[in-house]
Amino acid sequence: LGPLGAALRANLAAQWWDSAIPPREQVFAVDAPLHGPPGAPREARGLRLLHPETLRDALRGGGHSPALDRVLGTAGVLRESLLPGVLAQYVSCLELVNKRLPCGLAQIGVCFHSLPESEQPDENLTRIGERTTSLLAWFSSPRTAGQWLDYWLRQRLQWWRKFAVGPSNFSSSDFHDEEGRRGFKLHYKFPWGTETVETLKNLGDTELLQMYPGESSKLLGRDGRRNVIPHVLSVNGNLDRGVLAYLFDSLQLAENPLTTKKNSQRKVLKLHPCLAPLKVALDVGKGPTTELRQVCQGLFNELTENRISVWPGYLETVPASLEQLYTKYDEMSILFMILITDATLENGVVQLRSRDTTMKEMMHISRLKDFLTKYVTSAKNV
């Protein structure tokens, strides 16, 4: 991802955190390492972390040598899921909430996976892929686990649709895994077909009991007056695929009001205001360049201090027409372009141009911060 893509994914992750840790619920953020501790048996599945020279030295003794067993046994295993690392924090989480259920743990991080055989250039080699994933592990009593699964399904589907231009492209389907455990998949309808962006599943207590063998008493949480081993509800999202979904969702071809040519359309990336990497572009129009840039710099500092992301177009040295700037900023999904001109020096008025409506309005420079803050906040609360 480049700068804009990285900012888009960061904004999506920030919105995920806001939804995963609602004020009324006991959900805590954790951060497990990328790889597990050494000691996994040689035959255990998983991607190993090895220095090439160490592996070469071990292989010189033959493929089944004790040296190779030692090397594989001391290698860390790259995580393919956030779940084991999150579940390892369950007992500590339980103490924080005085053993009261329900409660939850959440993490965002990179996970690794073997690429499908169809994507391998050599059938004898296995390539490794990575993805940025989100996980909410929700611990509830077995009695209410089904209700909580339905609750999180509604919440998550509503969340994905909230930021979409075409909400109906996000859908859900139910399934049962090989062990009969119930779950749901949330999909996005891409041009080439439907792909999963998030999976919800009631894991029961199996994973917890495997994580803490012989220590089931540590797992007991309070459900009213009863002590129970909770069921784990896993809400596992693919943020990289989510970014791709919103890029496809927001790309629109609109009529170009700046030209009379037939079949002339402008490309607009109409990302939701909360997801747009940049909220504002600052540019200068006619007037004394030095003074106008000083005004832009002051406004840039004020907006960024208030966490409004700004593109400093006024620093550009290659001249461009307003039409070219509008096209560029629409494709960058910038919500507003602010034009500072000699009129700003005279009376403090700037021109504000909207990405979504292409309408231009005049506004006093002192009102910009509050206007932009309210605009993004109101979009978030819809």
What kind of feature is each model-predicted range?
Residues L1-V382:
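NTP/phosphate- and nucleic-acid-binding module
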